[in-house]
Amino acid sequence: MAWNGRFGEDGEEERSLELSLALPGYFSSSGLQGNTSTAADGAKGNDGFKASRPAAPVVGWPPVRSFRRNLASSSSSSKPPRGGRDAAAAATGGKVARFVKVNMDGVPIGRKVDLAAHGGYGELSAAVDRLFRGLLAAQRDPTMATAAAAAAAGESCTGEEEAIAGLLDGGSGEYTLVYEDDEGDQMLVGDVPWNMFIAAARRLRVLRSSDLNASTIRAGSRKRAAAE
């Protein structure tokens, strides 16, 4: 069979057909450049995503409700200003009131006395005497109610309104003034220095000397020796 010389032409046509079946612009320079730029952009995007810092945690999370914020602000505004005690002390001449309860045997009514308002045991004894002198007389004689009112008002008393003797005599008089300290012990008034007494006294009581316990006197003597 003779070759007609068209084989080459058919081969060329088939080759051109195969080339034409490829994707448009696959072998073109513009396509290569486009693919290269797309890959570069993707790489940049990946690098940028990896290089980005993690988001910082949200401060104040979980969120506080409004009514809690209002409650916190109101509580902070209601706090008393510092130095209130110092201001009160300055207003009263540098002394802060130190009130304690005072009770007396035979008198159902208690009183209060300001320890800081007195400068020593003598003044305290006189103040307790004024508080209970008339009340004690009224307990003994109901006709002395007027005298009791006068004594409560701090007025001077005469006649049968005698002073309560022996408050600071350590049990030698009819009545003895004792106090309860911060440890709950009953102590004789006058056994320790005045400043220590003011800091430790929580309650005063006027007891009959006959009702005093010997342990109270011994405990007072021990604390007085320790203070000295």
Swiss-Prot record:
Chain spans, region Disordered: 28-57, 70-90
Triggers of expression: Not induced by auxin.
Subcellular location per the Swiss-Prot or TrEMBL entry: Nucleus
Keyword terms of this UniProt record: Auxin signaling pathway, Nucleus, Repressor, Transcription, Transcription regulation
Motif (EAR-like (transcriptional repression)): 19-23
An annotated GO BP: auxin-activated signaling pathway
Tissues where the protein occurs: Expressed in roots, flowers and seedlings.
Function, as annotated: Aux/IAA proteins are short-lived transcriptional factors that function as repressors of early auxin response genes at low auxin concentrations.
Protein's name in the database: Auxin-responsive protein IAA16
Species whose genome carries this gene: Oryza sativa subsp. japonica
